[in-house]
């Protein structure tokens, strides 16, 4: 296991061929449609994240915003994230995955229109707040829905590919933001959600949610529609129903609602999920995402060239991660991704240090561009998607809603802290700010290497039993 954490399997080529065969067999029309709908939330999320940086200058100029006003616009998104996180678990458990997707897409549309027609800061912030609430719900909902409908051998690839849509959304809006006016760009942001709404009439509900709410008779029918009418889904349906019944019996004995998550048996899974979710945020993700324009300008890089280059690299990283997640495994990609983010933060700090001390002035812009590209490429290859994949895999159905709320809260609060404080941290010390982020990334690498196990190739029920029965003993590479 120690070697598996660092090296790609020797049979990666044959594994890739097998993966392609499995993908071909699994691509039934209902599954593909459900996958696309589940992935569109990630794309909408990416569009929202990618909107701020390229439009910063024009929005501030057109609406006469101060730095404090724009800092609020950037950070109020995470206030909405916190509000969405507070309700996401209860909402998805109460009304189901599909109806919750309805709610998030309607909020996305309203938020974009509010921004597009804003004449002052209040409507601008209201639109951003509504978008934040929707993201706070969908950022966990999407991975959960996809992992619950996907076959076990494709679960990682499907979830990672879905999260790749977030990287695509960021990249598309980074690029469009250099040529499209900010109001028109907001109108374009409505299109994905408007396209999803009619498709929601044709996708199935999660079979695991159906089992949880007592609709056992529908589980096998939904699995047949997802896997194909000729597939034998009896074993999969039996495993889902058996495990759900076991969880219900435990819930009857101990029904403490949200606080049930804090029992000793969930301590390991809660720690893994929460720390993995928080690492990208505390490692400066929102700082890079919302203020890339400021970083480029401060170090002498052309903003348009920087945005386009960064977009291409992030998309490439996301594609690479999607291809490898079910071949090399989640853990290997997490380690490589986290190491790359550490390198990106460190070289960004060095570029600011050189700029501030007037050293190597001709090379500093190149180093700054390189550092941002390394950061986003590394983030896209692993830390952008895999923490949410793991978080959607490791919690039993009875605490999945509470766990989703907790993970979302941690992500949202840490994102808000970074987004709101980032501009002030840059004024304090640009070099010191990115050294802080590099330190977090380095500590995150050690955490993953020491504690995070591999979940590739296991059913959700096997993973959840593994995490709740006893912490895995074979996760360390040191």
Swiss-Prot record:
InterPro entries assigned to the protein according to its UniProt record, in alphabetical order: MFS_dom, MFS_ERD6/Tret1-like, MFS_sugar_transport-like, MFS_trans_sf, MFS_Trehalose_Transporter, Sugar/inositol_transpt, Sugar_transporter_CS
Membrane-crossing segments per the record: 31-51, 67-87, 106-126, 129-149, 161-181, 185-205, 267-287, 305-325, 333-353, 366-386, 406-426, 432-452
Membrane topology, record value: Multi-pass membrane protein
The keyword Zinc-finger belongs to this UniProt entry's keyword annotation: no
Cellular component GO terms, alphabetical: membrane
Pfam families to which the protein is assigned, alphabetical: Sugar_tr
Molecular functions per Gene Ontology: sugar transmembrane transporter activity
Keywords tagged on the record: Membrane, Sugar transport, Transmembrane, Transmembrane helix, Transport
Location of this chain's protein in the cell: Membrane
Function: Sugar transporter.
Family statement: Belongs to the major facilitator superfamily. Sugar transporter (TC 2.A.1.1) family.
Protein name, entry field: Sugar transporter ERD6-like 15
Species assigned in the record: Arabidopsis thaliana (Mouse-ear cress)
